[in-house]
Amino acid sequence: MTKFSLLDHESVPKHEIMPEGELKSVLSKYSIEKEQLPKIKVHDPVCKEIGAVVGDVVKITRISQTAGEAEYYRLVIE
């Protein structure tokens, strides 16, 4: 039996754990602290699948009809 991957579904946008350097750049660009980002629970199925842990920041890349590609950021919490 093959394992089902949430990330392969057409309705699920790309999720990835942000490298520290890229995260610092984004936080600086928006003049915010990591704790001010929107949150996502560590028990979220996609967080489990990508191996995110509490304190990581997940970058979500969505396809947008108006913007082309749009990036969103979420802080992983308990």
From Swiss-Prot:
Its EC number is 2.7.7.6. It catalyses: RNA(n) + a ribonucleoside 5'-triphosphate = RNA(n+1) + diphosphate. SUPFAM superfamilies: RPB5-like RNA polymerase subunit. PROSITE patterns: RNA_POL_H_23KD. GO terms for biological process: transcription by RNA polymerase II; transcription elongation by RNA polymerase I; tRNA transcription by RNA polymerase III. Its main location: cytoplasm. It is found in: Cytoplasm. Part of the RNA polymerase complex. Belongs to the archaeal Rpo5/eukaryotic RPB5 RNA polymerase subunit family. This is DNA-directed RNA polymerase subunit Rpo5. The lineage of its organism: Archaea, Methanobacteriati, Methanobacteriota, Stenosarchaea group, Methanomicrobia.
